């Protein structure tokens, strides 16, 4: 099982998480739930390496993007080098 990336309704559509992701897991799509009219879903969670850069980049008080770590994969363990 890969890492799980969840985007919450508190997303403000700022694109900070999308720009911070080194593996392009996130992308912006149209969404009427915020002023920016866009949200960042995670269509490619299998590429997530669990670095949590998206969480660090999120400017909202309640992090709108959260990474829930699954078992380590060969790919995610490679970040240590």
UniProtKB/Swiss-Prot annotation:
Catalysed reaction, written as an equation = reduced [plastocyanin] + hnu + oxidized [2Fe-2S]-[ferredoxin] = oxidized [plastocyanin] + reduced [2Fe-2S]-[ferredoxin]
Broadest EC class assigned to this enzyme: oxidoreductase
* GO terms for cellular component: chloroplast thylakoid membrane; photosystem I
Q: Name the coenzymes or cofactors required.
A: [4Fe-4S] cluster
Cytoplasm in keyword set: no
Q: Where is the 4Fe-4S ferredoxin-type domain?
A: 2-31, 39-68
Protease among the record's keywords?
A: no
Any one GO MF annotation of this record: metal ion binding
The record's section on InterPro entries has: 4Fe4S_Fe-S-bd, 4Fe4S_Fe_S_CS, PSI_iron-sulfur_center, PSI_PsaC
Q: Which GO terms describe its biological process?
A: photosynthetic electron transport in photosystem I
Tell me how the cofactor is bound.
Answer: Binds 2 [4Fe-4S] clusters. Cluster 2 is most probably the spectroscopically characterized electron acceptor FA and cluster 1 is most probably FB.
Per UniProt, [4Fe-4S] cluster 1 binds at 11, 14, 17, 58
The EC number on file is 1.97.1.12
Membrane topology recorded in Swiss-Prot or TrEMBL = Peripheral membrane protein
In terms of domain of life, where is this protein from? Eukaryota
Query: Which coarse location class describes where this protein primarily resides?
Result: plastid
The compartments listed are: Plastid, Chloroplast thylakoid membrane
Q: Which controlled-vocabulary keywords does the entry list?
A: 4Fe-4S, Chloroplast, Electron transport, Iron, Iron-sulfur, Membrane, Metal-binding, Oxidoreductase, Photosynthesis, Photosystem I, Plastid, Repeat, Thylakoid, Transport
Binding residue positions for [4Fe-4S] cluster 2: 21, 48, 51, 54
Recorded hits in PROSITE patterns, A to Z, give: 4FE4S_FER_1, 4FE4S_FER_2
What is the documented function of this protein?
Apoprotein for the two 4Fe-4S centers FA and FB of photosystem I (PSI); essential for photochemical activity. FB is the terminal electron acceptor of PSI, donating electrons to ferredoxin. The C-terminus interacts with PsaA/B/D and helps assemble the protein into the PSI complex. Required for binding of PsaD and PsaE to PSI. PSI is a plastocyanin-ferredoxin oxidoreductase, converting photonic excitation into a charge separation, which transfers an electron from the donor P700 chlorophyll pair to the spectroscopically characterized acceptors A0, A1, FX, FA and FB in turn.
What NCBIfam families does this protein map onto? PS_I_psaC
Q: How does it assemble?
A: The eukaryotic PSI reaction center is composed of at least 11 subunits.
Name of the protein in question: Photosystem I iron-sulfur center
Origin organism is Ceratophyllum demersum
């Amino acid at each position: 099982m890969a890492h799980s990336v969840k985007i919450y309704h508190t997303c403000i559509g700022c694109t900070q998480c999308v720009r911070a992701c080194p593996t392009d897991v996130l992308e912006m799509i149209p969404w009427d739930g915020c002023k920016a009219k866009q949200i960042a879903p995670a269509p490619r969670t299998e590429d997530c390496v669990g670095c949590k850069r998206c969480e660090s980049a999120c400017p909202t008080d309640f992090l709108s993007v959260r990474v829930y770590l699954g078992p380590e994969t060969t790919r995610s363990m490679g970040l240590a080098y």
